[in-house]
Swiss-Prot record:
One of its GO terms (molecular function) is cobalamin binding. This is Ethanolamine ammonia-lyase small subunit. Pathway: Amine and polyamine degradation; ethanolamine degradation. It catalyses: ethanolamine = acetaldehyde + NH4(+). Keywords: Bacterial microcompartment, Cobalamin, Cobalt, Lyase. Adenosylcob(III)alamin binds at V207, E228. InterPro entries: EutC (IPR009246), EutC_C (IPR042251), EutC_N (IPR042255). Its EC number is 4.3.1.7. GO terms for biological process: amino acid metabolic process; ethanolamine catabolic process. The lineage of its organism: Bacteria, Bacillati, Bacillota, Bacilli, Bacillales. It is found in: Bacterial microcompartment. The basic unit is a heterodimer which dimerizes to form tetramers. The heterotetramers trimerize; 6 large subunits form a core ring with 6 small subunits projecting outwards. NCBIfam families: PRK05465.1.
Length: 293
């Protein structure tokens, strides 16, 4: 077989192959119409505004009224529900939102405008910032020489009572309660012919800072109003620590404490009246803490 015959044979084979091949017709699929996204202006509901005491997420509870009655007695997160082993999305978001509020309260400061409005005398402990305040509680109990002089110059020596306000671990607690509780304390003290004048405001305040203030001023009673460590229930809880003639290094048992002062606990006006009564009793009995019967 010569070259020419080989070419003819190959062409024949190719012709047979192409001739026997069937072609399929593919119908073009029309393109789908593009749907335009419509954006509307609106607002997302604030889940932190929901009253947990009135919210019941359990579907078809056996005793709905009894469940809600129990929830009215506590701010605990009762009556939640789940998707499989997990909490519902709404529950998780509310938890994170409340946790964020607590964090913000710890790391924020009391407004300087409020300090000026209330005519407080501002001083600072040895802490330079929030990080040092949180990691070095010992520095939040002490004042340097400059601050000692500021305290001495702006207080009455050997007064019967010295009121101190401290930011503590919750600036929100001070901003939410201080305007209500101070007039209540003042009004209550009038019943016992007692009063107070200049109020010290302590930035980066730890509770034992009141002990050094007691030694500087020589006051018979020192009352510290300070922000409590915030939790998931509220970031606005304040405490009152009161001591008769406090001294540096004294045992904690010498302090009398009124805690949970906020709108959902002991109202500030009510707490103020009770604080005034305690101060009077301390001055009468010359003691505080567990010694105060």
């Amino acid at each position: 077989m010569n070259e020419q015959e080989l070419k003819q044979m190959i062409e024949g084979i190719l012709t047979e192959m192409s001739g026997g091949k069937t072609t399929e017709t593919v119908e073009a699929t029309p393109a789908k119409a593009i749907t335009e996204t419509v954006v509307t202006e609106g607002s997302i509901p604030d889940i932190t505004e929901v009253d947990i005491k009135k919210q019941l997420l359990v579907p078809e509870p056996a005793d709905r009224e009894g469940y809600l009655k129990m929830k009215q007695m506590t701010p605990a997160r009762l009556g939640l529900w789940r998707a499989g082993p997990r909490y519902k999305t709404e529950t998780i978001l509310r938890f994170r939102a409340d946790h964020a509020v607590a964090q913000d309260s710890v790391f924020s400061y009391v407004s300087e405008d409020l300090v000026k409005e209330m005519n407080f005398t501002p001083v600072n402990t040895k802490c330079q910032d929030k990080d040092e305040y949180l990691t070095r509680p010992d520095l939040g109990r002490e004042f340097d020489d400059e601050m000692v002089e500021v305290i001495r110059a702006n207080t009455t020596k050997n007064a019967k009572l010295q009121i101190v306000v401290g930011d503590g671990l919750s600036s929100a607690a001070i901003e939410a309660n201080i305007k209500d509780i101070l007039p209540s304390i003042k009004q209550g003290l009038k019943m016992y012919n007692l009063d107070f004048d200049n109020i010290i405001f302590v930035k980066h305040c730890r509770v034992p800072s009141m002990d050094q203030i007691g030694e500087i001023t020589g006051a018979d009673v020192v009352c510290l109003l300070v922000g409590e460590r915030p939790g998931l229930v509220t970031a606005e809880s304040m405490s009152a620590y009161i001591a008769y003639k406090p001294t540096i290094g004294m045992p904690e048992a010498r302090r009398t404490v009124i805690s949970n002062i906020h709108s959902g606990g002991t109202p500030p006006v009510e707490a103020g009246a009770y604080i005034a009564e305690l101060i009077h009793n301390m001055l009468e009995k010359k003691c505080s803490g567990i010694d105060l019967k």
